Amino acid sequence: MRLAVLASGTGSIYKAIIDANIDVAVVLVDRLCAAIDLVNTNQTPCITVERTQFGPEFDRTKFSCDVVAALTEFNIDVVAMAGFGTVLDAPFFEAYEGRVLNTHPALLPSFPGWHGVRDALQHGVKITGCTVHIATLDVDEGPILAQAAVEVFDDDNEATLHERIKSTERDLYPATIKKFLTDLELSLIHI
């Protein structure tokens, strides 16, 4: 199975995937970011499809088609989103239906969207965590593959809680990716 990682930030999730000895065929980024340096250090091919090239009236469908075209060049079977900052459109999810994994910093279905950590704090929960799920056109709505709980401390702020969630995520996500790839190879997952 050929895995692509989509990243937009520091590359810490990509690093966790590599550190777990998961082969990554290519990393695709949507902007200049720190992940590129990390990818180059690990000698993984890196593609940039900059969202700024799609004008002030961002064409999400065209961008998604360009992402699919770029990944097709690498014969990608499975995609792991790793802090990817652009919401993709139907052409992407049609091309990789049931084979796009994502991680979210909350225990879905609670606190979906961009501000899961902040929302958990504002609601006063004592437990939050991270979720690995199949990404679909409906953001944070896909089937849940794995979750891990993280305690919320009384003195937590968004940054401290998010860092503990990310630490847990860096263990959970690679383990879930490995299991997903193995199950897919053994045809235990039907796409």
PLM region descriptions:
Residues A7, R60, S64, V68, ...:
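Amphipathic, non-transmembrane alpha-helical scaffold segments
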Residues I189-I191:
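Conserved small/polar residues in nucleotide/adenosyl-binding loops
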Residues R2-V5, Y14-K15, V49, R118-D119, ...:
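Membrane-interface segments of envelope glycosyltransferases acting on lipid-linked substrates or membrane lipids
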Residues I22-C65:
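Short, surface-exposed acidic-centric catalytic microdomains
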Residues P45, D77, K126:
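Residue-level detector of anion-binding/catalytic polar loops
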Residues A20, R31, N42, A82-E185:
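Donor/substrate-binding cores of folate-linked one-carbon enzymes
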Residues D59-P91, Y96:
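A glycine-rich beta-strand to alpha-helix segment
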Residues M1-I36:
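N-terminal Rossmann-like dinucleotide-binding module
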